[in-house]
């Protein structure tokens, strides 16, 4: 199928892969379960076809520990350490070159480029560009491609099912569609174990993560009649609780799960002088447009951004955008209340 944002089909990409020998595969910076699952599924599949394949990480940052069960994860190479030439660079779950970070240099050296993604994007970075925003996950697309290549297998199935389960919130988010259930069934038939994914990823929270949750809940700020909730974490929170950044990944979904909330936002200092923002929507509200206002992006119901000023500034500017965009009828009064509240927290935020 040729989607509106594509210039090719998965069938054509399969034929192109069959005609080439050396590949590099990379996903976006701060890779999540879908990004890693899709990339590793493709890596295992192409290697089963006799191809020479290297899986890359966009930066040297460690990946989420809870994904350590994924086969082949330990062999991923930080892109800055990879200096060889490859014929084909496959970008998976990446809407633009900026999100490749260090891997952009490998992308530029490659002779040919393929993009496989489910993020809507206004730009294209590949000669073969397949983008399907209707797909629940990049792993759904990777699995479809592997079927076309006749390159499915147990490892591929586990990686793909991990991506599908994590990006759909165990089949509970708005992006769920009939196809992801079909693919899930196929991966289980191929040897994937849903209980393994559930145990290792969804049922293995650390004590530091729970302590961060306590802090986040104590700082919740509700606006627009409880339809918008915002909270934050500071660098010192991670230090004092002995937590790593991955320990905070689940927290945005806890905010989203509060009764009456339509939009949730958490802002976290990332240890690099930046603020990482995560946005979630529980209805048809489009939070991706808010993320794009700050140079980020994502999906309609789940998006992220990086903010380059102080946490105090972020706690005014980003929630203001949310209120004005999603709740215009309440904007003037609620933005004024927000500004008063954040001014009262200045000393704590600057500490």
Question: Predicted segment positions?
Answer:
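Glycine-rich oxoanion-binding loops at beta->alpha junctions
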Residues: 62-63, 68-78
């Amino acid at each position: 199928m040729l989607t509106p944002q594509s210039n090719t089909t998965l069938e054509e990409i399969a034929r192109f892969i069959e005609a080439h020998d050396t590949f590099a595969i990379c996903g976006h910076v701060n890779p999540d379960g879908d990004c890693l699952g899709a990339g590793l599924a493709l890596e295992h599949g192409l290697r089963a076809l006799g191809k020479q394949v290297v899986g890359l990480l966009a930066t040297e940052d460690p990946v989420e520990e809870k994904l350590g069960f994924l086969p082949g994860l330990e062999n991923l190479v930080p892109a800055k350490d990879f200096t060889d030439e490859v014929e084909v660079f496959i970008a998976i779950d990446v809407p633009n070159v900026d999100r490749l970070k260090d891997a952009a240099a490998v992308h530029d050296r490659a002779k040919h480029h393929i993009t496989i993604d489910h993020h809507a994007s206004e730009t294209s970075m590949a000669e073969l560009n397949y983008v399907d925003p209707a797909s629940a996950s990049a792993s759904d697309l990777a699995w479809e491609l592997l079927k076309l290549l006749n390159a499915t297998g147990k490892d591929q199935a586990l990686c793909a099912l991990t991506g599908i389960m994590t990006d759909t919130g165990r089949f509970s988010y708005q992006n769920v569609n009939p196809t992801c259930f079909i693919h899930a069934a196929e991966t289980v038939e191929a040897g994937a174990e849903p209980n393994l994914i559930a145990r290792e990823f969804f049922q293995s929270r650390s004590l530091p993560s729970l302590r961060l949750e306590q802090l986040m809940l104590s700082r919740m700020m509700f606006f627009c009649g409880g339809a918008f909730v915002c909270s934050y974490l500071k660098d010192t929170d991670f230090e004092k609780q002995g937590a790593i950044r991955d320990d905070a990944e689940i927290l945005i979904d806890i905010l989203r799960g509060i009764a009456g909330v339509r939009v949730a936002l958490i802002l976290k200092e990332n240890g690099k002088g930046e603020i990482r923002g995560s946005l979630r929507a529980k209805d048809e509200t489009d939070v991706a447009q808010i993320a794009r206002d700050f140079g980020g992006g994502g999906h309609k119901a789940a998006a992220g951004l990086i903010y380059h000023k102080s946490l105090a500034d972020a706690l005014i500017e980003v929630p203001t955008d949310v209120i004005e965009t999603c709740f215009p009828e309440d904007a003037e009064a609620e933005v004024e209340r927000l500004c008063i509240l954040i001014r009262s927290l200045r000393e704590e935020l600057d500490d």
